Curated annotation (Swiss-Prot):
Organism: Bacillus cereus (strain ATCC 10987 / NRS 248)
Originating gene: bshC
Source organism, top-level taxon: Bacteria
Coiled coil: 460-484
Alphabetical list of Pfam families matching this protein: CC_BshC (PF24850), Rossmann-like_BshC (PF10079)
Protein name: Putative cysteine ligase BshC
EC number: 6.-.-.-
HAMAP family: BshC
Length: 538
């Protein structure tokens, strides 16, 4: 593997944060400097965590996922008062979801290792699976290439239930068929059989979406020491009850903190992305298998416009009796993470970084400082045939990132023709229309009754010119079909659907192409934290 860094333009909060703009950096409690991380360790030493209870739960959960010895040792290390975590999270996408999930985990592993060495304290990597999520449409699919088009392949469970990812049972038979359909779109390689067995082993050990995700990730990172946590596990929820109570008792202050911080963001020229009602409580409650967001209504906690209503005492009583019925929203999830884990750093994507900038005063309301927020490592893989296509078209590896691939294609095609087709036909249409307008005036003078027919005649002539233009373009494209197919392959590989590769393609394609140790070999590279994009030639 050969790795190269390129600068890809970013916008908004992320761009200004990475460029060191003081105004946006003031919305975070720590700069990304070594001194700031040292200060973070000191700040965490002054706080108390329920470490032993957490360790007991994580040991049981990770052992169930057949964690490697390094993971078990890291979980046990969390019981020590001077052990800290680098953490990131994601929904439980089928087959692990888009590549950026894998890249988040790689980011967590690398930063944890680096900070352990530089700070001289134990730092363990943790990945938080968002098991409370009920939106199956966000996790039940993957993208494949079929018939020279990118297709969204959705898993349709025969017995769908309205439940969280932690509780939604998978039909193993249906899921196996879905996986087979996906692999039919991949080329058969020397690794295909082993990869399918690898996936099937994980599926066979699973009952739910989160189980399947957890088993796959654990097998993929078996020797890394990665700790997994299901945010909606009933045993974890029991440990979180005291903090849920705290949020319920301070929900007005939480909402006020969010509002005030969003005003700061607006004054700095950014548009807030978290949308909440002014009476939001920022906690979900599961009612009749539905995740209902609670709101304040004259001292009562209500859901679904008053369909459900609880007093403070009733809500607290239900929390103590059935904590698994409660979960956090986008505002309180980071707070719960901060309550549960001694977090040295949180790693997030561009969207997460933007919405965390709106949470500073929310953290302060609860008495926390926001942990250092580190943008995750971004990666694009370029296979050998795509590198050859780039070379043949005299394109640099950075060109598809800095330019629209369709525009690159159009520019290349126009350079193959002496005179631009579009311009020549625009001129021709104008000249012909001018002549025809004059002709219509003449016809109108001689026989006004033919005016309508003359107008239709102009339309027909214009239609024929456009048909000629389309036929000419089609023939030119056919002449250069080999080269234009190279542009299509480049777009599909590097900018599928006009998006970054890591937001569309799934890691299983690369496991099938390069073997089950693909992720291990990617992790052998050293990635920088300078905000640049990493291009890996395979």
């Amino acid at each position: 593997m050969e790795i190269k860094e390129i600068s890809v333009p970013q916008q908004g909060v992320v761009a200004d944060y990475m460029n060191g703009k003081k105004e946006i950096q003031s919305c975070f409690d720590y700069m990304l400097t070594e001194d700031a991380f040292k200060q973070r360790v000191q700040d965490l030493r002054e706080r108390e965590f329920f470490r032993q209870d957490l360790v007991a739960h994580l040991l049981e959960y990770n052992t169930k996922l057949q964690a490697g010895e390094a993971t078990i040792q890291n979980v046990k290390a969390l019981g020590d008062e001077d052990t800290y975590v680098v953490i990131a999270g994601q929904q439980a996408g089928l087959l692990t979801g888009p590549l950026y999930t894998i890249h988040k985990i790689i980011s967590v592993l690398q930063l944890a290792k680096e900070k352990e060495e530089s700070l001289g304290v134990k730092v363990v990597p943790v990945f938080w699976i968002a098991g409370e999520d009920h939106d199956m449409d966000e996790i039940n699919h993957t993208f494949v290439t079929k018939n020279k088009k990118i297709k969204k392949t959705i898993f349709h469970d025969r017995n769908p239930k309205k439940a969280s990812a932690s509780e939604s049972e998978l039909s193993l038979e249906d899921c196996r068929k879905w996986i087979e359909e996906i692999f039919k779109t991949y080329p058969e390689t020397n690794f295909t059989k082993d990869v399918l067995q690898f996936i099937d082993d994980s599926l066979g050990e699973s009952n739910t979406y989160v189980d399947f995700f957890g088993h796959l990730i654990m097998k993929m990172f078996i020797n890394s020491g990665l700790i997994l946590v299901d945010s909606h596990h009933p045993e974890l929820r029991k440990l979180e009850v005291p903090f849920f109570k705290q949020i319920i008792s301070k929900y007005k202050e939480v909402q006020e903190g969010l509002h005030n911080q969003q005003e700061v963001i607006k004054e700095l020229g950014y548009k807030p992305i978290i949308e909440t009602k002014s009476n939001a409580v920022h906690i979900f409650m599961e009612i009749d298998n539905e995740r209902v967001l609670l709101e304040d209504n004259q001292g009562k906690f209500v859901g679904k416009d008053g369909t459900y209503s609880f007093s403070y005492e009733e809500l607290i009583e239900e929390m103590e009796r059935s904590p698994e019925r409660f979960s956090n929203n986008v505002v309180t999830r980071p707070l719960m993470q901060e309550y549960v884990f001694p977090t040295l750093a949180f790693i997030g994507g561009p969207g997460e970084l933007a919405y965390w900038s709106e949470l500073q005063q929310v953290f302060h309301t609860i008495g926390f400082r926001m942990p250092p927020v580190v943008p995750r490592i971004t990666i694009t893989y370029i296979e050998r045939d795509i590198a050859t296509d780039l070379h043949d078209l005299q394109l640099q590896e950075s060109d598809p990132f800095l330019n629209n691939v369709d525009k690159l294609r159009e520019n290349w095609l126009s350079n193959q023709i002496e005179e631009p087709i579009d311009e020549r036909f625009v001129e021709a249409k104008k000249e012909i229309i001018d002549i025809h307008k004059s002709l219509q005036q003449f016809v109108k003078k001689i026989d006004p009754g033919l005016s309508s027919f003359a107008g239709k005649n102009e339309f027909k002539i214009n239609e024929q010119i456009e048909l000629l233009e389309r036929m000419l373009k089609r023939n030119v494209e056919k002449k250069h079909e080999v080269e234009l197919n190279k542009f299509r392959r480049i777009q599909f590989a590097i900018r599928p659907l006009g998006a970054p590769q890591e937001r569309v393609w799934n890691v299983c394609y690369y496991l099938n192409q390069f073997g089950l140790d693909f992720v291990d070999r990617v992790m052998e590279n050293s990635f920088s934290w300078n905000g640049k994009h990493h291009v890996i030639k395979l």
